[in-house]
Amino acid sequence: MSENFEKIKAAPLFFGIDEAELPELLEALDARSRRYQKGEIIMPEGEKTNSLGLVMSGSVLIVQDDFWGNRNIMARITQGGIFAESFACTGEKLTVGAEAESECEIMRLKVGHVLGSCPKSCAGHAKLVGNLISELARKNLNFNSKLGHMGKRTTREKLMSYLSAQAMKSGKNEFDIPFDRQQLADYLCVDRSAMSAQLCALRDDGILKFKKNHFILLR
């Protein structure tokens, strides 16, 4: 646990919690770490979980795969981020799956153990609950943003909506996106070939430049 202590302190879930309170809080959360290989399923869709996942290293994709194998990428979680918190809190079956995008280390935390009242009324407990609510709110905003992109009528409009949002997020017109081509197509729920054709059309129309996952938006 000691080698991960700095990563835990830096995670948004534990922001503002006194370092002296962390060991006891982690014990209450029954914190357990495990490493996963690229492509390995961390939490399968359709099962229940009483634990959220905290990404200690690497990255995780939150995905939905339908009966025919079509994939919808819901989110990409990197170091310090959490996933499955809604399902851990409610006890509902997972409607998405969590898959290791790269080799990663995941710490499972039984967050339900601290959702009730704390007998010691400790500040760390209250802060953790507040941080969890903030993370849930942030995830909701990100999901609404994804719905906004997907709600556009054409592949071209979906691309422009997503890239515009990324430019606004970075604060400049030149930026990197976190997805490769297939992942971006899965995130926007479009055909990869059609999306690639539209990217080339946008480039030819003088709207943007790109190389791999690096983009420059033009006026």
Q: What residues fall within each predicted segment?
A:
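Cyclic nucleotide-binding regulatory module and flanking cytosolic helices
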Residues: 1-38, 87-89
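Short, small/polar residue-rich loop motifs at catalytic or cofactor-binding pockets
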Residues: 28-29, 47-49
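Cyclic-nucleotide recognition modules
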Residues: 29, 73-133
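Glycine- and acidic-residue-biased ligand/ion/polar-headgroup-sensing regions
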Residues: 39, 50-63, 68, 79-80
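Short phosphate-coordinating micro-motif centered on Lys-Gly-acidic
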Residues: 41-47
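Short, Lys/Arg-enriched, Trp-marked, Pro/Gly-tolerant hinge/linker segments that flank
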Residues: 123, 143-155, 169-175
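Long, hydrophobic or amphipathic alpha-helical segments
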Residues: 129, 133-136, 140-143
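Phosphate-/nucleic-acid-contacting segments
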Residues: 155-158, 162-219
